C-alpha cells in the first residue's frame, strides 16, 4: 500500500467515525404533556397501557370520573352497570359521545389498584388528565374514586347532593364538582335511585338542559 492509498483509507475511516448517531427518542415528561395522547405515552413508559385513558368526547365540558373497572370490561362502565349508566345519561339528554369518561385506575391496569408506587404515579397522571381536559364540571362516581381523588374516607352517600369546588395542585381554575352514585350501588340499592335522579336533574340544570 502506498502513501496515497493509506491516506484515502484513513479518510474513509474518519468519515465512518463521525457518522451522526441515530436519533434517540426522548422520554415524555408528565407536566409537559399537553394532550391525552402524550399522557398515554408517559404512562406507557412504565406500564403496559393497552386502552385509551379517555372515552367519549375529550373536549366535553363535563368529565365523569369512575373508580376502577372489572378485568373483563370492554369499556369504562360495562355490562349491567354500563347499561344503567347509559340510561342515566339519556335521562338528562346526554350519551357517551358527548361526555368525557375516565377511570381513576385505567382500564387494563386493575391489578395495580393496591400498588403504592403505581398509585403515587397515577394520582399525578389523573391530576394532569383533569388539567388537560379542563372540564367545567367534574362528576365523581364510586367511593374508590372519592377516596383517591378527593383524599377523604367520606362515602358517596355523605358527599352527594351538593356542588363543591375541586382544584388539582397546578390548576388555578376550580371545577364544579359533584358526587353521583355509581351504577353498581344503584343496582344493589334501588331505593337510592330517587336521590340519584335528583343529582342528575341538578347536573342537567347546570348544563342548561
Regions found by a protein language model. Give the residues of each.
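A polyanion-binding, active-site-adjacent surface
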Residues: 2-209
